[in-house]
């Protein structure tokens, strides 16, 4: 078979700012956290309760839990899981697992029973660390997933409903008076050892278990500490996050922050006033958000009440952010732009990131160090040059080891040459900025035309009466699919279906008109990270409009 690769059209990331350091992900985290512990730095702050955890306290508890897990009988290749909403204790089992070479599978108590049975059935953990909120579901799942031997309560100092608290689990499984300083991290084969089992986004069915190695994680740490693609390492810097920790975006930004000595200020639920007050009170220099929250901030009438002069960066990830909303929010916060990143669970974290001082409206960024990317033609699979749309493919040391017990699905996404096919449509310009247009599977096929929902969503969001919108294809026997939209109107505003359709028709080419109709809804269906749920939108659009 002829080699279709044209090297001129492969985009390479730069050399890393710092070489990747020796040791497992656990060994590196312990070394960094020990350094910040000696400085007295704060690791986590719960902005709602005011509770702080210093690096010294967090490291001590994580090391003691690591020792307890070893004494319980977990060895390299063992498995533990979490089932919890964001809480300040969330990363203690994560760190403990990384310290001893045990794979960690994070889930969230918001999962349905079916999703949790599926997810924990893939990772087969021996121990599940559950929040009090998640306990009932985990107890039920244990009846089906027999690998689960022990349930430990993550967010309680005392035993709860007959289940051991994490503190008491540590006491029971470590010698009296044991100190974290005596704990020894376990060395592992970095390239092979699974560090985390994350859930794929599951946009085409139930999620798959994504195996990420210690090599994947330490490469991510080098990006987190890179002053151009990550952060200036400055212990004590306060960063506000409202991103779910169980998700790849929340997991790897937070672990990266711990390597930098940052104070991670958490908001366990989003409320506009509390959010702005927290930014002010903790003098946060950066905030990390999912796109859903940008629309709220863009229309906020409270911004001027607060002193946000310390804020120098807003970062977005977890789902695509429209160019218009990003620019509008940046203007409102007096910032040059919004820092974006693009990645998949299968690529560990973002592999395209806005470099410091090099943002371009609408772009996701440039290829990170140690990675390369290309755009291929959807039909011929040939590598394309600048400004030509195709499927984005990437290659580098953060690609997953594979899906758990699913070699067939692994081969479908990573080809024989080691390129991961993202399933996203995009292009890059002459300056090597990448633009992600839409999901390949989301494209609406109308009479042979390919219509990207994200483009129509962006058009809808520019209308002053429209607060939020989502677009999907409605099956049609003649055209294949018809573009349709669900729309949330601004408070106090009104529009008819025809007015919305006429507005879109005035902005787009003929094939992109909303022939599938418009439905007015209270909320656009979205996942936890703000990804629009096309399947749910399709179901809404299929239903007949209720007659008054």
UniProtKB/Swiss-Prot annotation:
Q: Which reaction does it catalyse?
A: firefly D-luciferin + ATP + O2 = firefly oxyluciferin + hnu + AMP + CO2 + diphosphate
Gene Ontology, cellular component aspect: peroxisome
Enzyme category, top tier: oxidoreductase
Q: Which CDD domains match?
A: Firefly_Luc (cd17642)
Question: Which SUPFAM superfamilies does the record cross-reference, listed alphabetically?
Answer: Acetyl-CoA synthetase-like
User: Which family does the record claim for this protein?
Assistant: Belongs to the ATP-dependent AMP-binding enzyme family.
- UniProt GO BP: bioluminescence
Q: Which organism is it from?
A: Aquatica lateralis (Heike firefly)
Which residues form each disulfide bond in the chain?
A: none
Tell me its EC number(s), please: 1.13.12.7
Which keywords label this protein? ATP-binding, Luminescence, Magnesium, Metal-binding, Monooxygenase, Nucleotide-binding, Oxidoreductase, Peroxisome, Photoprotein
Asked if the record carries the keyword Signal, the reply is: no
Name under which the protein is recorded: Luciferin 4-monooxygenase
Q: Required cofactors, per record?
A: Mg(2+)
What InterPro entries does the database record attribute to this sequence?
AMP-bd_C, AMP-bd_C_sf, AMP-binding_CS, AMP-dep_synth/lig_dom
- Sequence motif Microbody targeting signal, residues: 546-548
Task: Read off the PANTHER family from this record.
Answer: GM05240P (PTHR24096:SF423), LONG-CHAIN-FATTY-ACID--COA LIGASE (PTHR24096)
Q: What is the lineage of its organism?
A: Eukaryota, Metazoa, Ecdysozoa, Arthropoda, Hexapoda
So what does this one do? Produces green light.
Q: Where, per UniProt, does this protein localize? A: Peroxisome
Which GO molecular function terms does the record list? Answer: ATP binding; CoA-ligase activity; metal ion binding; Photinus-luciferin 4-monooxygenase (ATP-hydrolyzing) activity
């Amino acid at each position: 078979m002829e080699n279709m690769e044209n090297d001129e059209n492969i985009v390479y990331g730069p050399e890393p700012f710092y070489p990747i350091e020796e040791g497992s992900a656990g060994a590196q985290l312990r070394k960094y956290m020990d350094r910040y512990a000696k400085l007295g730095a704060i690791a986590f702050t719960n902005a709602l309760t005011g509770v702080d955890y210093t690096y010294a306290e967090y490291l001590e508890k994580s090391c003691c839990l690591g020792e307890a897990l070893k004494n319980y009988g977990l060895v390299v290749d063992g498995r533990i899981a979490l089932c919890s909403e964001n809480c300040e204790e969330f990363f203690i089992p994560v760190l403990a697992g990384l310290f001893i070479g045990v794979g960690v599978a994070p889930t969230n108590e918001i999962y349905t029973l079916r999703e949790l049975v599926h997810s924990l059935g893939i990772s087969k953990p021996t121990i599940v660390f559950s929040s009090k909120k998640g306990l009932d579901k985990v107890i039920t799942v244990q009846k089906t997933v027999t690998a689960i031997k022990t349930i430990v309560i993550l967010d309680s100092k005392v035993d709860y409903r007959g289940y051991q608290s994490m503190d008491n689990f540590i006491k029971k499984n470590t010698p009296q008076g044991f100190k974290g300083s005596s704990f020894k991290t376990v060395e592992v084969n970095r390239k092979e050892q699974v560090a985390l089992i994350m859930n794929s986004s599951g946009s085409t069915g139930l999620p798959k278990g994504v195996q990420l190695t210690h090599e994947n994680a330490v490469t991510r740490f080098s990006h987190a500490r890179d002053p151009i693609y990550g952060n200036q390492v400055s212990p004590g810097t306060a960063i506000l996050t409202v991103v779910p920790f169980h998700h790849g975006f929340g997991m790897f930004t937070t672990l990266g922050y711990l390597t930098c000595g940052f104070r991670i200020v958490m908001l366990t639920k989003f409320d506009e006033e509390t959010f702005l007050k927290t930014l002010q009170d903790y003098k946060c220099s950066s905030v990390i958000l999912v796109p859903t929250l940008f629309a709220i901030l863009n229309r906020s009438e409270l911004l001027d009440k607060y002193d946000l002069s310390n804020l120098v960066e807003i970062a977005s990830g977890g789902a695509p952010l429209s160019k218009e909303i990003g620019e509008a929010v940046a203007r409102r916060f007096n910032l040059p732009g919004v820092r974006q990143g693009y990645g998949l669970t299968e690529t560990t974290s973002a592999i395209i990131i806005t470099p410091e001082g090099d943002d371009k409206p609408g772009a996701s960024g440039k290829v990170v160090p140690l990675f390369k990317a290309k755009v291929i033609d959807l039909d011929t699979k040939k590598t394309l040059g600048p400004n030509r749309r195709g499927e984005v493919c990437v290659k580098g040391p953060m690609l997953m080891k594979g899906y758990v017990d699913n070699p067939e699905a692994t081969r479908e996404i990573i080809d024989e040459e080691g390129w991961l096919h993202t399933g996203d449509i995009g292009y890059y310009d002459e300056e090597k900025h990448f633009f992600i247009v839409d999901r390949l599977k989301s494209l609406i096929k109308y009479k042979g035309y390919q219509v990207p929902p994200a483009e129509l969503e962006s058009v809808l969001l520019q209308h002053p009466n429209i607060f939020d919108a989502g677009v999907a294809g409605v099956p049609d026997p003649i055209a294949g699919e018809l573009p349709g939209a669900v729309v949330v109107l601004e408070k106090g505003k009104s529009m008819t279906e025809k007015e919305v359709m006429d507005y879109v028709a005035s902005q787009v080419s003929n094939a992109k008109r909303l022939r599938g109709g418009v439905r007015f809804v209270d909320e656009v269906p979205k996942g936890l990270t703000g990804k629009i749920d096309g399947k749910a939108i399709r179901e809404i659009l299929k239903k007949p409009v209720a007659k008054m």
